[in-house]
């Protein structure tokens, strides 16, 4: 089963562009993934490919399996069947920044990679997210948006092939979210990881994604390439896929 369905609304990708995409290395490949909790099937024979440099967003109702899929890709949840193939362990940024309060910002950035990255690498990563000169500061002195910037720096400091984002902007105010969207797009363009962003926000998906997936009942129900649509045309289609009235 391929999850990238050719939906009637989606125009075909030009052959030359498709060939370039197909030559890009895979950040992750998933085949036949299944996860059960008792008798309930949360992920049902799911297939998924994400290529390096591709930004994929995953929409769906609560309980459809989005976070379970992300946790499986991150190695935090063991699937019951199927294969997950990735060149290396991915990086994950969660809704909560999960910074250690007793560690400085640079120590948080290199957590688990102290000997291979060190302070110099942390300083560079913090500068990339607009926190230059704050290496020796403490998490308690940061705003919510600044803390998520540190979490992003930690996620990208080792240049992962795959970056997993689990609603990292959901708790931020509207203006900070907009700023974070711009920062994430800039960082992804610079580092070229494959990205899977789990979100409930259709507008966030339209702003960030190269490809938007809609998950329903443990399966990928629809796939769209935003470049083939105007946001005004695609937004009501996505809302309809999610079972939301777009009036």
UniProtKB/Swiss-Prot annotation:
Localization in the cell: Cell inner membrane
EC number: 7.6.2.14
A molecular function GO annotation: ATP binding
Reaction it catalyzes: ATP + H2O + aliphatic sulfonate-[sulfonate-binding protein]Side 1 = ADP + phosphate + aliphatic sulfonateSide 2 + [sulfonate-binding protein]Side 1
PROSITE patterns recorded: ABC_TRANSPORTER_1, ABC_TRANSPORTER_2, SSUB
Membrane topology: Peripheral membrane protein
SUPFAM superfamilies: P-loop containing nucleoside triphosphate hydrolases (SSF52540)
Binding site for ATP: 60-67
Transmembrane domains' residue ranges: none
Entry keyword set: ATP-binding, Cell inner membrane, Cell membrane, Membrane, Nucleotide-binding, Translocase, Transport
Gene Ontology cellular-component annotations: plasma membrane
A family per Pfam: ABC_tran
Domain annotation ABC transporter: ranges: 28-242
Main subcellular location: membrane
SUBUNIT field: The complex is composed of two ATP-binding proteins (SsuB), two transmembrane proteins (SsuC) and a solute-binding protein (SsuA).
Function (record text): Part of the ABC transporter complex SsuABC involved in aliphatic sulfonates import. Responsible for energy coupling to the transport system.
Family recorded in the similarity comment: Belongs to the ABC transporter superfamily. Aliphatic sulfonates importer (TC 3.A.1.17.2) family.
Name of the protein in its database record: Aliphatic sulfonates import ATP-binding protein SsuB 2
Species: Paraburkholderia xenovorans (strain LB400)
């Amino acid at each position: 089963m391929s999850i990238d369905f050719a939906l009637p609304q989606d125009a075909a990708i030009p052959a030359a562009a498709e060939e370039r995409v197909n030559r890009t290395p895979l950040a992750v490949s998933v085949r036949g993934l299944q996860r059960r909790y008792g008798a309930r099937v949360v992920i049902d024979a799911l297939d998924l490919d994400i290529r390096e440099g591709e930004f994929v967003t995953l929409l769906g109702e609560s309980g459809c399996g989005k976070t379970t899929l992300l946790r499986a890709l991150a190695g935090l949840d063991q699937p019951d069947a199927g294969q997950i193939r990735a060149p290396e362990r991915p990086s994950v940024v969660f809704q909560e920044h999960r910074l250690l309060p007793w560690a400085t910002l640079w120590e948080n950035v290199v957590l688990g990679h102290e000997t291979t990255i060190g302070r110099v690498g942390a300083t560079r990563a913090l500068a990339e997210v607009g926190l230059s000169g704050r290496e020796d500061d403490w998490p308690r002195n940061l705003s919510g948006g600044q803390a998520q910037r540190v979490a992003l720096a930690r996620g990208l400091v080792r240049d992962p092939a795959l970056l997993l984002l689990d609603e990292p902007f959901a708790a931020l105010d509207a203006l900070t979210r907009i700023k974070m969207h711009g920062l994430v797009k800039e960082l992804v363009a610079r580092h070229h990881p494959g990205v899977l962003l789990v979100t409930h926000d259709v507008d966030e998906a339209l702003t960030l994604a190269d490809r938007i997936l809609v998950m329903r009942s443990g399966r990928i129900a629809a796939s769209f390439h935003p470049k083939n649509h105007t946001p005004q045309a695609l937004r009501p289609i996505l809302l309809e896929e999610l079972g939301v009235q777009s009036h």
